[in-house]
């Protein structure tokens, strides 16, 4: 998001990433704020309230308008064929275990999973796809009280489907690739038709194509004569791959320089400003000059933040100072009540100002280093369901601040 925002603003952009990123591990949905700790029904309103009550939270610096702008920008980039929703109202979807989780934007293939009282669902599993447990999902949907009140009923059916002859332990991606083939998907849909009762909504694992997804969804809907939705399974998740592929292709088409599989190993600082970063490429290290840097490496899960064996915290890419929750010592970052109160460790990260410029104790660390996403301190993203909202809002603020200060200069976004 930061790279595309900068590129469309006229900057020359290099995107450096050690790996393919976490999007394809996700469900292809976009969270803004799901819990505070109670379930949220109006995400933007909840962001405002959270920001006013918790000044240490990233949303207090980002602000709801930047989050809204980030959501709108992402939808502009991807279009309605990838994401539906407006962030104003929560969309509630069944998970891979049948629990109902809140989110803000969803792929069109999932929107019918926003169940209401009285809905009847048939969950169809594929015997060769062992990461999708249709019976468990149906049982939990059947007994759940829906967020809007009432209940849906659900039952499960499991059928045989070999994406390739003799493939008895298939992945979601191999099934999705096989369903990109029109003959294969139509044969499967015809075979499922007899299981579906009139009025039932059909829930399938999120494997309805990777490159020809819209056509796959349309064929299943037409042949089954029913509303169809995907339920995300265990990562890596096909809807996340679709969204990741769309953004990468868009960035390349818009002439963002994309450096994949290379780690940033250091930077050169002159007069308090990072003037270049060093990237470990095959053969020799490469120096990339930069007028501004956006650090978007994620948190502990991606390796951008690290707690070493001595209990010391590190930011591993640019060696920026890491802040902890107020009043917490390093030895208390992880407590023994694992199923109780939040672990302070996950609120650690880099400190930023309202422009997402990285600071420490209120002063800029470098005059041109900004942060976006999970590396920013103050949010327990997985528990709040705030990850994408924080990432999008901070990316918008960082990119716009850079464009205001350096205009069409080169900006390097780094991920580790």
Q: For the regions a protein language model found, what residue spans apply to each?
A:
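N-terminal Rossmann-like FAD-binding beta1-loop-alpha1 element of flavoenzymes
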Residues: 1-15
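A conserved FAD-binding loop/helix module that cradles the flavin
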Residues: 4, 303-314, 366-367, 376-409
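Short hydrophobic core segments
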Residues: 13-16, 264, 287-298
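Conserved N-terminal glycine-rich FAD pyrophosphate-binding loop of Rossmann-like flavoproteins
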Residues: 18-55, 163-177
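Dinucleotide-binding Rossmann-like beta1-alpha1 core, especially the glycine-rich loop
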Residues: 32-115, 119-126, 137-140
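Helical element adjacent to the flavin cofactor pocket in flavoenzyme catalytic cores
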Residues: 132-144, 179-198, 202, 208-267
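FAD-binding beta-loop-beta segment adjacent to the flavin cofactor pocket
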Residues: 248, 284-285, 322-328, 335-381
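Conserved beta-strand-loop-beta-strand element in the redox core of flavoprotein oxidoreductases
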Residues: 248, 267-287, 293
